[in-house]
């Protein structure tokens, strides 16, 4: 498990392009037959992936996080971005098609990932956060999520937001997770942008051709920087940073938040004229 440390915004604005990428961009997440994870000290979130092929993959024990098993004091949200697969949580099997999700509650001792077709495997993206109580493990069908259609073609941001894990749906201790799908010919996300001082966020971009990318904007509103993000890469966004992007074509991204609360209304909009 790779470890990333937190950073003060005054340090961030002095970083080079390569330093920004090293600290905040998560590359090479998906490897066949492996589980990969990054632990960020920003709200102690773990971002990871699993690509099971011939054999199922078992989430490692909790030794790296000071626990007897991985979910001893954690919860986890999982979304499949690949072909059909399954997750087994303490013996209970959940079949997941592409874009289906799963919330697994604290105290689940064993978590396994598998693919129906090893030659065309499932690709599980997951985010885990600390937890203080056990909520029920629950499958999330994208067709049954709360969906909100926003934006317009004239603003190049027509999109649908699907809420997977949130207070009015599948409940959790602190994890909030969902997916945003941009319509064809639409390329902007989260603009006008905002901040949420009491929550961090991770954006994971996918469903892009290999030669496409998203110009992801981050930093304080008056000290913005950018990261070139390609298919199936993620960006860690501290609470002091905006998180917005524009792509060379339309794309999909999974967003996940953790922190002090789960309130969507607890944000600070950033006026467009203040961006620099």
From Swiss-Prot:
InterPro entries: KduI, KduI/IolB_isomerase, KduI_N, RmlC-like_jellyroll, RmlC_Cupin_sf. Zn(2+) binds at residues 194, 196, 201, 243. It catalyses: 5-dehydro-4-deoxy-D-glucuronate = 3-deoxy-D-glycero-2,5-hexodiulosonate. It comes from the Bacteria. Binds 1 zinc ion per subunit. Pathway: Glycan metabolism; pectin degradation; 2-dehydro-3-deoxy-D-gluconate from pectin: step 4/5. Keywords: Isomerase, Metal-binding, Zinc. The keyword Transmembrane helix does not apply. The keyword Endoplasmic reticulum does not apply. GO terms for biological process: D-galacturonate catabolic process; D-glucuronate catabolic process; pectin catabolic process. Its cofactor is Zn(2+). It is an enzyme of class 5 (isomerase). One of its GO terms (molecular function) is 4-deoxy-L-threo-5-hexosulose-uronate ketol-isomerase activity. Its EC number is 5.3.1.17. Catalyzes the isomerization of 5-dehydro-4-deoxy-D-glucuronate to 3-deoxy-D-glycero-2,5-hexodiulosonate. Belongs to the KduI family. This is 4-deoxy-L-threo-5-hexosulose-uronate ketol-isomerase. It comes from Caldicellulosiruptor bescii (strain ATCC BAA-1888 / DSM 6725 / KCTC 15123 / Z-1320) (Anaerocellum thermophilum).
